[in-house]
């Protein structure tokens, strides 16, 4: 327990709150360029080939972002928009690519949850 004099000399430091997505720097989204598009395997007990991209952001950060939905058109040098949000079974993947923004196309033939995958309303 510090004395009053010690607290006057050196006040208490407030604890800094850690953010789940530091590369966004308090912005809702960030633009980036794909440097590598690849598949990774999830941790146990799951098994799949999850599509991810290594993205160099406009603020200089390089992050791994998940590509949601079935099928995608991304390749190296594609311009993408990323948002926060981790993928629980992929360690180190803390961002999602937004479908239907910039060079990323929406998911084809999607009827439900379209807004999350950048799909236009189908013609009746």
UniProtKB/Swiss-Prot annotation:
Gene Ontology MF, one: structural constituent of ribosome
Positions bearing 3-methylthioaspartic acid: 89
A single GO BP: translation
Keywords annotated in UniProt: Methylation, Ribonucleoprotein, Ribosomal protein, RNA-binding, rRNA-binding, tRNA-binding
Gene Ontology terms: cellular component: small ribosomal subunit
Matching Pfam families: Ribosom_S12_S23
Statement: the UniProt record of this protein carries the keyword Aminoacyl-tRNA synthetase: no
Entry keyword tRNA-binding: yes
Location of region: Disordered: 1-25
InterPro entries, A to Z: NA-bd_OB-fold (IPR012340), Ribosomal_uS12 (IPR006032), Ribosomal_uS12_bac (IPR005679)
Family, similarity comment: Belongs to the universal ribosomal protein uS12 family.
HAMAP family, A to Z: Ribosomal_uS12_B
The protein's assembly and partners: Part of the 30S ribosomal subunit. Contacts proteins S8 and S17. May interact with IF1 in the 30S initiation complex.
NCBIfam families in UniProt: rpsL_bact
Its biological purpose: With S4 and S5 plays an important role in translational accuracy. Interacts with and stabilizes bases of the 16S rRNA that are involved in tRNA selection in the A site and with the mRNA backbone. Located at the interface of the 30S and 50S subunits, it traverses the body of the 30S subunit contacting proteins on the other side and probably holding the rRNA structure together. The combined cluster of proteins S8, S12 and S17 appears to hold together the shoulder and platform of the 30S subunit.
Name used for this protein in its record: Small ribosomal subunit protein uS12
Underlying gene: rpsL
């Amino acid at each position: 327990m510090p004395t009053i004099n010690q607290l006057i000399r050196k006040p208490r430091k407030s604890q800094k709150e850690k953010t789940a997505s530091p590369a966004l720097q308090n912005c809702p989204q960030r633009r980036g360029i794909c440097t590598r598009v690849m598949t990774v395997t999830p941790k146990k007990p799951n098994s799949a080939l999850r599509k991810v991209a290594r993205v160099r952001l406009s603020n200089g950060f390089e992050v791994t972002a998940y590509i949601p939905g079935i099928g995608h058109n991304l390749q190296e040098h594609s311009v993408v928009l990323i948002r926060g949000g981790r993928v629980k079974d992929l360690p180190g993947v803390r961002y999602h690519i937004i479908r239907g923004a910039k060079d990323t196309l929406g998911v084809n033939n999607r009827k439900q949850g379209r807004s999350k995958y950048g799909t236009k309303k189908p013609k009746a």
